[in-house]
Amino acid sequence: MNELTERAERTTTIAEATEHWWIADERIGGAQSDSYSVYTRAGVIFVDPLPLTYAAADRFPAVSFALLTRGCHQRASWRYRFEHGARVLAPRGSWGLLTEPDQHYVEGTRLPADFRAIRTPGPEYDHYALYRPGDANILFVGDLVTRRDSSSPLELSEDTPRLRPGISRDSLASLLDLEFDLLCMSHGGYIDDDPKGALVELYERTA
C-alpha cells in the first residue's frame, strides 16, 4: 500500500536494538498496521516502514535500509530514502511500486546485517518473510500471518486466487523449522511470548 496521511507519534523498544511503531490504518478499516527498526552494524534498518511524525523520526537521523516484505508495503519508504538516505530493497516481481527500488531481492540474495529472505507465497506470489538471527532471533512475516490488533487471534493469509490452494499454509509450515524469539507482523503487532508456539497453533488450527 502507498503512504498514509496518518503518522505514528512514537516508537517503542520491544527487544534489544529493535523498535516498533503502529497506526490504526484507515485504508483497511482501522485495523493495525506495523513497522519495525533494527539497529545493526550496517546501520538502522526499517522493515515495511510506516510514516512517523517529524518529531518521532528525529530518533533516526540516518536510515541505512528499508526492507519490504512485499511491494505494497512500500508505505513511507520513498520519504525515508529522500529524507534519511535509506536504500530501498523490495522483492523481485513487486508490482505497484511508486518508483524503482535500489535493489530487488529473491531468496538467497545477500541482504544487509545477516537478514535472510524466505519466500512465502500466499498473500501474493512474490511475498517474503525476513529472518534476522542475533542475540534475539527475529522473524518478520509480512502479511502471511496477521491479526486485526494485538488482542485479536492470529489469522493465516487467504491464498491469492491465482495461486494453488493451501500455498499459504505450506509457507507457514516452512517457517516452523526456524528458531525465533520475536515474531513481527506487518498487521497486528508482535509476539514475544512463545512466538513459535503461536505459529504452531495457527498451523494446526488451519488444517
Model-derived features with residue positions:
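Metallo-beta-lactamase
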Residues: 2, 6, 13, 18-20, ...
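Residues that act as N-cap/strand-start positions at coil-to-secondary-structure junctions
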Residues: 8, 30-32, 99, 105, ...
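Pre-active-site segment of Zn-dependent metallo-hydrolases
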Residues: 23-65, 100
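Short acidic-hydrophobic, aromatic-tinged amphipathic segments that line or gate anion-handling sites
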Residues: 102-112
